[in-house]
Amino acid sequence: MAQTLYDKLWDAHVVHQESDGTCMLYIDRHLLHEVTSPQAFEGLALAGRQPWRVGANLAVADHNVPTLNRAQGIEDPISRLQVDTLDDNCAKYGITEFRMNDLRQGIVHVIGPEQGATLPGMTVVCGDSHTSTHGALGALAFGIGTSEVEHVLATQTLLMKKAKSMQINVEGELPFGCTAKDVVLHIIGIIGTAGGTGHAIEFSGSTIRGLSVEGRMTVCNMAIEAGARSGMVAVDDKTIDYFRGRPFAPVGVLWDQAVGYWRTLHSDAGARFDRVINVDARDIKPQVTWGTSPEMVLPVDGRVPDPDREKDDVRRSGMERALEYMGLKPNTPLVDIRVDRVFIGSCTNSRIEDLRAAAVVARGKRVAANVRQAMVVPGSGLVKQQAEREGLDKIFIEAGFEWREPGCSMCLAMNADRLEPGERCASTSNRNFEGRQGQGGRTHLVSPAMAAAAAVAGHFVDVRSFR
């Protein structure tokens, strides 16, 4: 019987299935960070248990770490306590951790693939919703809650029911000036933030195959913003080449065996999905969100929508609230919206290709006078090192951008990098909810190139014609 990629990954990890469909699923890789792990470790200790498989765990502090003056430590006492607690728990149980000043430290969803700790065919979980990122590598990856973190530590399994399957097929050559971020924002604009609810999404088609592995990670990262718990892409030669020489990747005969298995990780011809969405890449343009949800998104050459034209009462009310929070007026051209801050980073867009794309735009230019701060935050110490080797840091610094240490940074207001009330930010992150980047902060989601262009122009511009 023909199987989808999701079917194959799921079936390979079912340990036991109950009559109601509840399955015990084996977990291959468990990624830990400082925010959702303390209570899980505490529960483990109170029950007198040890981690079932220590080597399956990999930890890193990312949410709370400072991106400036790191040698001075963490100023906020709660943030410092969470990081110290992770350090202590990993030392206690012998779990590998990349500590704050380790070159390998970074955002958990960047360092997992970077190290080869995430591999095709794995089940990968983390106490973070954007774990879906790892599905770009042909893995079944999803976020879990703190109680589930404890359960995985103790048993290396989870109890759950299989989701429905959805295929989002994107065909055609990606237009000039458009990136993986524009692809996924365009998709969310079509299906909405609830479109994938209850489904595991496989992204497929010639456009997806044409993306780099890092671009595919950007797409799968935001599967959760489309309502799905997990997103995935079939394995191909790009995937396999990505893992050659990674520290945690198999070597020798084991590599050959692994590659043989990895090449089976695709949906079979004739496999049936519960829902199929077809997207024409020719319709994609550089995207900008205008509201307080990722589905409130438009092409950069569009205008802020007018709620009076919306017939649905609930949607109209949501639009009115979003416009009030964002301080925008209906029918305003998106290119007329000025920005106060620019953030290039996050688990969505902080990899080396993202920084290269932003640097191409920033080269030889200057951040606009009305932009109070433009910051670039690499996704890991190794990404930062590579960028500096290529001279990208100098391009950004000479243009007036701040060059920071790796971490989650301004993606969320859990560290020193945050917006002040009323500040408007062009951000390469994944969520534009009210207060996401700081109380009263106004977030517009864009690609790295679009963010860099906004920093230089002082307002949103169409990167396709920006000079």
Swiss-Prot record:
Record-linked Pfam families: Aconitase (PF00330)
Signal peptide range in chain numbering: none
Origin superkingdom: Bacteria
Top-level enzyme category: lyase
Catalysed reactions, semicolon-separated: (2R,3S)-3-isopropylmalate = (2S)-2-isopropylmalate
Enzyme Commission identifier(s): 4.2.1.33
UniProt keyword annotation of Iron present: yes
Cofactor: [4Fe-4S] cluster
Binding site for [4Fe-4S] cluster: C347, C408, C411
Free-text cofactor note: Binds 1 [4Fe-4S] cluster per subunit.
Entry-linked InterPro entries: 3-IsopropMal_deHydase_lsu, Acnase/IPM_dHydase_lsu_aba_1/3, Acoase/IPM_deHydtase_lsu_aba, Aconitase_4Fe-4S_BS, Aconitase_4Fe-4S_dom, IPM_dehydratase_rel_enz, IPMI_cat
GO molecular function: 3-isopropylmalate dehydratase activity; 4 iron, 4 sulfur cluster binding; metal ion binding
Family annotation (CDD domains): IPMI
Pathway: Amino-acid biosynthesis; L-leucine biosynthesis; L-leucine from 3-methyl-2-oxobutanoate: step 2/4
Coiled-coil boundaries: none
GO biological process, alphabetically ordered: L-leucine biosynthetic process
Keywords: 4Fe-4S, Amino-acid biosynthesis, Branched-chain amino acid biosynthesis, Iron, Iron-sulfur, Leucine biosynthesis, Lyase, Metal-binding
Subunit organization: Heterodimer of LeuC and LeuD.
Main function: Catalyzes the isomerization between 2-isopropylmalate and 3-isopropylmalate, via the formation of 2-isopropylmaleate.
Protein family according to the UniProt entry: Belongs to the aconitase/IPM isomerase family. LeuC type 1 subfamily.
Annotated protein name in UniProt: 3-isopropylmalate dehydratase large subunit
Species assigned in the record: Bordetella pertussis (strain Tohama I / ATCC BAA-589 / NCTC 13251)
This protein's encoding gene: leuC
